[in-house]
Design a protein with these regions (language model features):
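P-loop NTPase catalytic core of nucleic-acid-dependent motor ATPases
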Residues: 11-102
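AAA+/P-loop NTPase substrate/partner-engagement loops
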Residues: 75-80, 87-133, 196
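Pre-Walker A (Motif I) flank of P-loop NTPase domains
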Residues: 67-72, 118-120, 168-169
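A generic local secondary-structure boundary/capping motif
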Residues: 45, 111-112, 159-163, 175-179
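Phosphate-sensing "switch" segment of ASCE/P-loop ATPases
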Residues: 19, 162-169, 176-217
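Conserved AAA+/SF3 P-loop NTPase catalytic/coupling segment centered on the Walker-B
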Residues: 119-149, 175-186
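Modules that initiate DNA replication and primer synthesis
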Residues: 1-4
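Substrate-gripping "pore-loop 1 plus following alpha2 helix"
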Residues: 103-108, 135-167, 211-214
Length: 217
């Protein structure tokens, strides 16, 4: 009972210090219009248009807490906004639930701590940075875990040790190139809007951000 009271006190203190954020989160959870509210949050972060992609990205990122999360590859030409979409999505997630990487070597994921990736949003901003780790990424997405046998030295000499890295994860990356079929069959494939209308929306948002009102947001 004492532990329950202490937990209630901690939660009450948190709500007091984070009242606005707490109220906003509750409003979103109770709203039938929650996905449009999410899209509006993207707008507040400077990512305009792309309503469907914003909703899909948010759902994929939050699916990390589920048993079978979604993973995403975003494809577009260079400088079309795919990285901006990923960064905005990461900003809407708890910082400690995001593993944001520039490069992943062949054995890097196998050598992580057992729970380091469990139910995390794993981002590799450009797929080329993880080409060496394609096998481990595919396995983690599909099997929800990585296992390997490594040789460790002990006082009695070398011994074999089983290493386990547990998922599942929601994996997100971007590319301008053709995607390997073995990976594309495991992910949600999105294309960024490169239309003239979307370009105009971006330019308008950039101009608005330079106004006094935009700088005060």
């Amino acid at each position: 009972r004492l532990a329950e009271l202490e937990q209630d006190t901690v939660m009450a203190t948190w709500r007091t210090h984070h009242r606005a954020a707490y109220d906003h989160a509750v409003d979103m959870l109770l709203s039938p219009d929650v996905l449009n509210m999410v899209a509006a949050d993207y707008e507040n972060l400077g990512y305009v248009g792309e309503t469907a992609n914003k909703k899909l990205m948010y759902l994929a990122a939050t699916s990390r807490i589920m048993a079978d999360p979604l993973s995403v590859i975003i494809k577009s030409s260079s400088a079309a906004g795919k990285s901006k979409l990923v960064k905005a999505t990461a900003e809407l997630m708890p910082a400690d639930q995001v593993e944001d990487l520039s490069r992943v070597s062949k054995k890097a994921l196998f050598n992580m701590e057992r729970d380091a990736l469990s139910h995390k949003l794993v981002i590799v901003m450009e797929k080329a940075g993880a080409d060496d780790a394609d096998y481990s990424i595919r396995t983690l997405i599909t099997e929800k875990t990585l296992t390997s046998r490594v040789t460790m030295m002990s006082a009695d000499g070398p011994r074999s040790e089983l290493r386990v890295v547990e998922g599942p994860v929601s994996y997100v990356t971007t590319t301008i190139d053709k995607v390997d079929e073995q990976l594309i069959n495991r992910v949600l494939f999105l294309r960024v809007d490169e239309s003239e209308a979307q370009t105009a929306r971006i330019h308008e948002a950039q101009r608005a951000a330079r106004t006094t009102q935009g700088l005060e947001r």
